[in-house]
A protein has these predicted regions:
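Ribonuclease/tRNase effector modules and their secretory precursors
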Residues: 1-117
Length: 117
């Protein structure tokens, strides 16, 4: 297995699937958003303990969007809502696709499946 396919971390999603973060996807995330480089733990925590989980519009590939609020993101000039996009390829496993901060307004564009009360 190549270095880029090496698993960096594995976390459990709300549904119980083991979601992996590979070196390739981690490089993708920090290349697109270098300010997230110090927030790997928060990205993983978003999958493990989300505030909300969304599904994309029907025409988009099957993936989930976990959202969690981290006020400390504001300390580096980012929106405090962190979204982690991931895919569950079976009931037991999946992988992280990407992660990004968003505003409250933008997150309403996708369909909420679950919300912490």
């Amino acid at each position: 297995m190549g270095t880029l396919n090496r698993t960096v971390a594995i976390v459990k999603s709300r549904s119980g699937a083991q979601i992996r973060l590979t070196e390739r996807q981690w490089k993708h995330i920090i290349t697109a958003r270098p300010q997230l480089e110090d927030f790997q733990d928060e990205i993983l925590k978003t999958i493990e303990d989300p505030d909300e989980v969304y599904a994309p519009p029907p025409r988009v590939r099957p993936q989930l969007h976990a959202l969690k609020k981290f006020r400390l993101l504001r300390n580096v000039g980012l929106n405090e809502n962190l979204v982690v996009v991931y895919r569950e390829i079976s009931p037991r496993e999946g992988f992280i696709i990407t992660a990004f901060p968003i505003s409250d307004i933008r997150r309403r564009r996708i369909h909420r499946l679950w919300r912490r009360l």
